[in-house]
Regions:
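Basic, nucleic-acid-interacting segments
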Residues: 1-299, 316, 337-341, 355
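Structural motif
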Residues: 3, 313, 336-345, 383-386, ...
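Amphipathic alpha-helical segments in well-ordered regions
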Residues: 64, 232, 335, 348, ...
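Small-residue helix-packing motif on alpha-helices
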Residues: 168, 319, 345, 391, ...
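Core structural elements
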Residues: 191-204, 309-331, 342-360, 372-374, ...
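Extended, non-catalytic structural segments that build the interaction scaffolds
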Residues: 289-296, 333-340, 374-386
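Strongly charged, low-complexity linkers/loops
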Residues: 364-375, 379, 388-458
Length: 477
């Protein structure tokens, strides 16, 4: 009988925090600067430089901990993780091993069978990011950019509670939403502000002890994470089926090839010779500080969904999609505040917005158009200044450039023609030029009138009022 295997998965999720300055110095965290321009003696590890903790990093870490039901460590410290690598100018990383800021939390996820499952969070700790090595353009050397060195991170370490790729994605989506709602990070995997390392092992179904785990790196999308989990599961099962042993190691996933390769043996904590950082004072979290952070907690998704049902009266499906992104929820509320038309705003977000997002493979966090301009577009439609096809045409431009739709209509001459005399003359010409369609309609073929409406709209360059065209056609026929 073939053996059945269970997958056991734990995650280490690194989140780049949305502070303006780095964790231990005043250098900018802005993305995209010239190499080595956002640096100073502290974040490049110069002798004699002393770090000072950015208070906002601590506040963000505590806020995430509270939102994930963690215990907050009231007295904590930083530790040095010692290793040598060119992107690590100090030859150690300041992190937290012994007294992480948050412990023993968890989040509820929805499972594929419609139930819920709690995924435990072992700890959340603060640490600094390393620099960035650039290998691609040179064969005999690598370059290093220290702009990222010292950028603040939190690492969220889960318990090994996940059993499938679907559970992993549900957990990551839940974490991402919580952190985005807090404003602690934009959590964009493709830009590296959220990164997940997957620790995975397999064991025979029913076995209590864990198998040997590997750590999968270079995962920058949910699709890559799913493929990496499925690929690594199969690789480990094949090894066990052939009588071999899985090696504890770190592996790099190559998404283009759909396979992983070994990078190095997997280290344990003792390999890094951790010790308390002597340059940083202990962290003391007072009751007053905790109260202040709790008081700033936003309205999270569950509460927002309940409010939308009573306040806006839009369908549950729309509510689920809109609140699934903080940016889209903010966009919805800001637009409704201007035009007071929740159903129409929801229709634009659920219709054209989702269509274009799918077409362009975009996240909701990347939407560029403003609430003001979406409100103007809705007003133009309501005032029958433009017809629905022109409105969609304008929205496509607005989706890319956030143009002012009122100005665009004036500049492009897109205002709807509702002059009955002009419409009647055009309809008469269309009737004269399409005798077969006229005969078909008079013989009971209702679809023929749709063709005649289309021909009229074409003649009017899309600027006619379709309802008036339809009315005039029926009158003349």
């Amino acid at each position: 009988m073939a053996k059945e295997y269970e997958t056991v998965i734990g995650l280490e999720v690194h989140v780049e925090l949305a502070t303006r300055t780095k964790i231990f110095c005043g250098c900018s965290t802005a993305f995209g600067g010239e190499p080595n321009t956002h640096t100073c003696p502290v974040c490049t590890g110069m002798p004699g430089s002393l770090p000072v903790l950015n208070k906002q990093v601590l506040e963000y870490a505590i806020a995430v901990g509270l939102a994930t039901d963690c215990e907050i460590t009231r007295y904590g410290k930083f530790d040095r993780k010692n290793y040598f690598y060119p992107d690590n100018p100090q030859n150690y990383q300041i992190s937290q091993l012994y007294l992480p800021i948050c412990r023993n939390g968890g989040v509820e996820i929805e499972t594929e069978d419609g139930g819920t499952k709690r995924i435990g969070i072992h700890e959340i700790h603060m640490e600094e990011d390393a620099g960035k090595l650039i290998h691609d353009e040179w064969e005999d050397c690598s370059l290093v950019d220290y702009n990222r060195s010292g950028v603040p991170l939190i690492e969220i370490v889960s318990e090994p509670d996940m059993r499938s790729a679907a559970e992993v994605i549900a957990y990551l989506e839940k974490l991402r939403l919580i952190i985005q709602y807090l404003g602690a990070s934009d959590c964009k995997l493709q830009e590296g502000s959220m990164r997940a390392d997957v620790n995975l092992s397999v064991r025979e179904t029913g076995q209590k002890s864990f198998g040997t785990r590997t750590e999968m790196k270079n995962l920058n999308s949910f699709k890559a994470i799913t493929r990496a989990i499925e690929g690594e599961r199969e690789r480990q099962i094949d090894i066990l089926e052939e009588g071999g042993q899985v090696i504890q190691e770190t592996r790099r996933w190559d998404d283009t090839k759909g396979e992983s390769y070994a990078m190095r043996s997997k280290e344990d904590a003792q390999d890094y010779r951790y010790f308390p950082d002597p340059d940083l004072v202990p962290i003391v979290v007072s009751e007053e500080m905790l109260k202040e952070i709790k008081a700033k907690q936003p309205e999270f998704r569950t509460e927002k969904m309940a409010r939308y049902r009573t306040e806006y009266g839009i369908p549950d499906y729309d509510i689920d999609i809109i609140t699934g992104s903080k940016h889209m929820a903010d966009l919805f509320e800001a637009t409704v505040a201007i035009c007071n038309q929740p159903k129409k705003v929801s229709n634009w977000l659920m219709g054209e917005t989702l269509r274009l997002m799918k077409e362009k493979d975009m996240d909701a966090e990347d939407l560029r158009f403003s609430p003001e301009n979406l409100s103007k577009l809705i007003r133009l439609s309501d005032a029958r200044a433009i017809n629905s096809s022109v409105a969609k045409e304008i929205f496509e431009v607005m989706f890319e450039e956030d143009i002012n739709p009122e100005r665009y209509v004036e500049e492009k001459g897109l205002k709807m023609v509702s002059d009955e005399g002009a419409l009647r003359r055009t309809v008469e010409e269309v009737i004269a030029n399409n005798p077969q369609s006229v005969e078909d309609y008079r013989n009971g073929k209702e679809k023929a009138i749709g063709f005649l409406v289309g021909q009229t709209m074409k003649a009017m360059k899309g600027k006619a009022d379709p309802a008036m065209v339809n009315q005039i056609l029926k009158e003349l026929l």
